[in-house]
């Protein structure tokens, strides 16, 4: 996998790489839009799978081979399948769910404008020149120290950053996931009066004399069960003699 990303960089340069980038990004954008536009909840769960597959292709083009392989495993194998199981547990009908979409249009428009404003703000900060004099920096002398340092793989770099600089945030995210898991269990553990349940302790504590079942054997060799019950709820007085007589 380490040789896969450089191969993509070598073979796909210029127009070819831009074409592949457009081919992978366009279905991702359309699928992301269909996640919120699909009226069938099952389709809304299946569209993110296509988004994650396209995202893996984009990560391979960027040279992040480890992230490209771990993204489908985590997102498709865990999150998307979990969402699909939740939809199946809710017993949602396959028929399309009619809902007023325009009622959420103002809120979604405001969130979209905030998102685009943040994106333009980030891009403006990225285009700030390195020197305040705005001179041409191509004639400056510099030394590339990247080749003199031992190169790390994507996995080593990710592990070094995750468990050193971002260790606190890693623990916070794990606690958030733990709270979410416990909360999902607590939400499903609710009692309702519509379900018929049986009190096992009370059932076992009933008087066994009212449920005596005696197997008797007839003289002709046929076996049958005979249930004894008296008017007071107990067995008759002569059930022992009857059992001895058939034996």
Swiss-Prot record:
Record keywords: Electron transport, Membrane, Mitochondrion, NAD, Respiratory chain, Translocase, Transmembrane, Transmembrane helix, Transport, Ubiquinone
Membrane-traversing stretches: 18-38, 44-64, 70-90, 104-124, 168-188
Catalytic reaction list: a ubiquinone + NADH + 5 H(+)(in) = a ubiquinol + NAD(+) + 4 H(+)(out)
Entry's EC annotation: 7.1.1.2
EC class name: translocase
Membrane topology: Multi-pass membrane protein
Compartment(s) of residence: Mitochondrion membrane
Lineage: superkingdom: Eukaryota
GO cellular-component term (any): mitochondrial membrane
SS bond list: none
Primary location group: mitochondrion
Keyword rRNA-binding: no
Gene Ontology MF terms: NADH dehydrogenase (ubiquinone) activity
Role summary: Core subunit of the mitochondrial membrane respiratory chain NADH dehydrogenase (Complex I) that is believed to belong to the minimal assembly required for catalysis. Complex I functions in the transfer of electrons from NADH to the respiratory chain. The immediate electron acceptor for the enzyme is believed to be ubiquinone.
Protein family: Belongs to the complex I subunit 6 family.
Protein name: NADH-ubiquinone oxidoreductase chain 6
Organism: Triticum aestivum
